[in-house]
């Protein structure tokens, strides 16, 4: 039995399979996940688990070189944006239109759905290398 880190076997598998520049999405309960993208659904009830809790745990295990965030979060959910920035102080952030972020999920290895119900609580993480 795994003792530490992300306990969800599907998340652990996807992270272990990530290569340089692969994408992994993490987001709120309302995000439409493309049929071709694996969905790892963690939602239990509204707000559980939270987007930030899941993101923080994923970031403990995944080397991230870049994060894509919907530009709409700047005006529609600035509190969440500040929380995201605190989790990745040294990672490049690129803001893109929300419609583009949703389309880009087609190229992600997987999408982790949380119970979050606040607007634009979605990111795409681009995997880096550890050497």
Swiss-Prot record:
<feature type="active site" description="Proton donor">
    <location>
        <position position="20"/>
    </location>
</feature>
<dbReference type="InterPro" id="IPR023064">
    <property type="entry name" value="D-ribose_pyranase"/>
</dbReference>
<comment type="similarity">
    <text>Belongs to the RbsD / FucU family. RbsD subfamily.</text>
</comment>
<dbReference type="GO" id="GO:0048029">
    <property type="term" value="F:monosaccharide binding"/>
</dbReference>
<dbReference type="Pfam" id="PF05025">
    <property type="entry name" value="RbsD_FucU"/>
</dbReference>
<dbReference type="GO" id="GO:0005829">
    <property type="term" value="C:cytosol"/>
</dbReference>
<keyword id="KW-0119">Carbohydrate metabolism</keyword>
<dbReference type="GO" id="GO:0016872">
    <property type="term" value="F:intramolecular lyase activity"/>
</dbReference>
<keyword id="KW-0413">Isomerase</keyword>
<comment type="subunit">
    <text>Homodecamer.</text>
</comment>
<dbReference type="GO" id="GO:0019303">
    <property type="term" value="P:D-ribose catabolic process"/>
</dbReference>
<feature type="binding site">
    <location>
        <position position="98"/>
    </location>
    <ligand>
        <name>substrate</name>
    </ligand>
</feature>
<comment type="function">
    <text>Catalyzes the interconversion of beta-pyran and beta-furan forms of D-ribose.</text>
</comment>
<feature type="binding site">
    <location>
        <position position="28"/>
    </location>
    <ligand>
        <name>substrate</name>
    </ligand>
</feature>
<comment type="pathway">
    <text>Carbohydrate metabolism; D-ribose degradation; D-ribose 5-phosphate from beta-D-ribopyranose: step 1/2.</text>
</comment>
<dbReference type="InterPro" id="IPR023750">
    <property type="entry name" value="RbsD-like_sf"/>
</dbReference>
<dbReference type="InterPro" id="IPR007721">
    <property type="entry name" value="RbsD_FucU"/>
</dbReference>
<dbReference type="GO" id="GO:0062193">
    <property type="term" value="F:D-ribose pyranase activity"/>
</dbReference>
<protein>
    <recommendedName>
        <fullName>D-ribose pyranase</fullName>
        <ecNumber>5.4.99.62</ecNumber>
    </recommendedName>
</protein>
<keyword id="KW-0963">Cytoplasm</keyword>
<feature type="binding site">
    <location>
        <begin position="120"/>
        <end position="122"/>
    </location>
    <ligand>
        <name>substrate</name>
    </ligand>
</feature>
């Amino acid at each position: 039995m795994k003792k530490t880190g992300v306990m969800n076997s599907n998340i652990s598998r996807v992270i272990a399979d990530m290569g340089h520049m692969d994408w992994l999405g993490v987001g709120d309960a309302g995000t439409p996940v493309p049929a071709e993208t694996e969905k790892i659904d963690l939602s239990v009830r509204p707000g559980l688990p939270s987007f930030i809790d899941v993101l923080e745990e994923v970031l403990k295990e995944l080397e991230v070189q870049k994060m894509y965030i919907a530009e709409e979060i700047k005006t529609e959910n600035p509190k969440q944006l500040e929380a995201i920035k605190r989790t990745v102080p040294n990672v490049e952030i690129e803001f893109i239109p929300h419609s583009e972020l949703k389309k880009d999920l087609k190229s992600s290895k997987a999408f982790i759905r949380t119970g979050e119900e606040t607007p634009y609580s979605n990111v795409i993480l681009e995997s880096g290398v550890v050497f």
